């Protein structure tokens, strides 16, 4: 089996390579090849593979020699290469982090702790396109999958608190630049205990509204503020990110024909790489909270139910705690005043791990027959 990697240097690709190294995945890959869009003929990264030279990621003939292609190169690359490659007669497996092919009928959105049965059926039935899901959707399902898998959810609404990493590496840098620039504007006043906080606040507010605030990537301030819209406007009042929440969740669960209604608002906040979500769910029956917690906790090895208490919540349910880990904590689970079937939940997860790289890493192992 020849496996080709494209986009291994970018943010998601780098996290994928790091995770594959940690899990010794390259030992399960008979022949690994690395492709590039910018440095053809250069030295490939060394993961113990025989092929030491970078190949041309835009060369369809070269790509067609692969049995599996794993790409984190982005949607534009997929749009330019995928169809010509298939048209050339290539019948290999395409594993992709980008959203371009997600909703195609001949593609499966992969999140194996939640939809391993869908993936296995796809492999049996000759499906060759395995696509990583939207980060927010994947993280919600890792946390709340137990309720969805047991068909207990009548509807759900998710209000998100999404990290800068979802918009890209430059946006993460811009967030930190914004934080630093705000501090620099009032550093002297902060150092002086007698300075008035309202004066400091006014200087910060003026700076946030000024042209000097670094916002080339987000377009508006994020540090010290938030952005109540993510992705393009679909023209019906919904953003594309919000639309994905419903359609992708149902596709992952294999129930696009009989969908669970899911909707909500997606908001960008000043977190680096962890998405958080506040959810309201209407269940199909009035279950005790203890039973709900047991169903959630038993769904997979990574979800962690946090007791609905102040100290546990403020220490365990935060981006600061979760960043860089595979843990997906879920807490704030309680009955709402609307009635016994209505529950709240709050969950946090790393946007680059279960939100992006980890489902690809695992589906590659599944296709190779080693997971």
UniProtKB/Swiss-Prot annotation:
The keyword Nucleotide-binding does not apply. Phosphate binds at residues 102, 244. It comes from the Bacteria. Catalyzes the NADPH-dependent formation of L-aspartate-semialdehyde (L-ASA) by the reductive dephosphorylation of L-aspartyl-4-phosphate. It comes from Neisseria meningitidis serogroup A / serotype 4A (strain DSM 15465 / Z2491). InterPro entries: Asp-semialdehyde_DH_CS, Asp_ADH_gamma-type, Asp_semialdehyde_DH, NAD(P)-bd_dom_sf, Semialdehyde_DH_NAD-bd, Semialdhyde_DH_dimer_dom. The lineage of its organism: Bacteria, Pseudomonadati, Pseudomonadota, Betaproteobacteria, Neisseriales. Homodimer. The active site is at 135 (acyl-thioester intermediate), 275 (proton acceptor). The keyword NADP applies. PROSITE patterns: ASD (PS01103). It holds the Pfam family Semialdhyde_dh. Belongs to the aspartate-semialdehyde dehydrogenase family. Pathway: Amino-acid biosynthesis; L-lysine biosynthesis via DAP pathway; (S)-tetrahydrodipicolinate from L-aspartate: step 2/4; Amino-acid biosynthesis; L-methionine biosynthesis via de novo pathway; L-homoserine from L-aspartate: step 2/3; Amino-acid biosynthesis; L-threonine biosynthesis; L-threonine from L-aspartate: step 2/5. Gene3D superfamilies: Dihydrodipicolinate Reductase, domain 2, NAD(P)-binding Rossmann-like Domain. This is Aspartate-semialdehyde dehydrogenase. It is an enzyme of class 1 (oxidoreductase). The gene is asd. One of its GO terms (molecular function) is NAD binding. Substrate binds at residues 162, 241, 268.
């Amino acid at each position: 089996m020849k496996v080709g990697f494209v986009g291994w240097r970018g943010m998601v690709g780098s996290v994928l390579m790091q995770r594959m190294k940690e899990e010794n995945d390259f030992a399960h890959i008979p022949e690994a090849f690395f492709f590039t869009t910018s440095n053809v003929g250069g030295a490939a990264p060394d993961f113990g593979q025989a092929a030491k030279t970078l190949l041309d990621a835009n060369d369809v003939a070269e790509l067609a020699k692969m049995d599996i292609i794993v790409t984190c190169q982005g949607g534009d690359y997929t749009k330019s290469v995928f169809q010509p490659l298939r048209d050339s007669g290539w019948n290999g497996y395409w594993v992709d982090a980008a959203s371009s092919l997600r909703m195609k009928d001949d593609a499966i959105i992969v999140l194996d702790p939640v939809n391993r049965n869908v993936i296995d059926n796809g492999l049996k039935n000759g499906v060759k396109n395995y696509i990583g899901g939207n980060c927010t959707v994947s993280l919600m399902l890792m946390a709340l999958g137990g309720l969805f898998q047991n068909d207990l959810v009548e509807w759900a609404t998710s209000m998100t608190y999404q990290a800068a990493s979802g918009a890209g590496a430059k946006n993460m840098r811009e967030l930190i630049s914004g934080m630093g620039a705000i501090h620099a504007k009032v550093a002297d006043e902060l150092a002086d205990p007698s300075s008035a906080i309202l004066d400091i606040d006014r200087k910060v507010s003026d700076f946030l509204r000024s042209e000097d605030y670094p916002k080339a990537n987000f377009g508006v301030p994020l540090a010290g503020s938030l952005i109540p819209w993510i992705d393009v406007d679909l023209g019906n009042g919904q953003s594309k990110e919000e639309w994905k929440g419903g359609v992708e969740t149902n596709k992952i669960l294999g129930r696009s024909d009989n969908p669970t209604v899911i909707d909500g608002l997606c908001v960008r906040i000043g977190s680096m790489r962890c998405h958080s979500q506040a959810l309201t769910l209407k269940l199909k029956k009035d279950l005790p909270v203890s039973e709900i917690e047991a169903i959630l906790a038993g769904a997979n090895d990574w979800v962690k139910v946090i007791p609905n208490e102040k100290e546990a919540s403020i220490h365990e349910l935060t981006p600061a705690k979760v960043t860089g880990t595979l843990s997906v904590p879920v807490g704030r689970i309680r009955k709402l005043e609307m009635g016994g079937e209505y529950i709240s939940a709050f969950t946090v997860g790393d946007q680059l791990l279960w939100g992006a790289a980890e489902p690809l890493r695992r589906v590659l192992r599944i296709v190779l027959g080693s997971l």
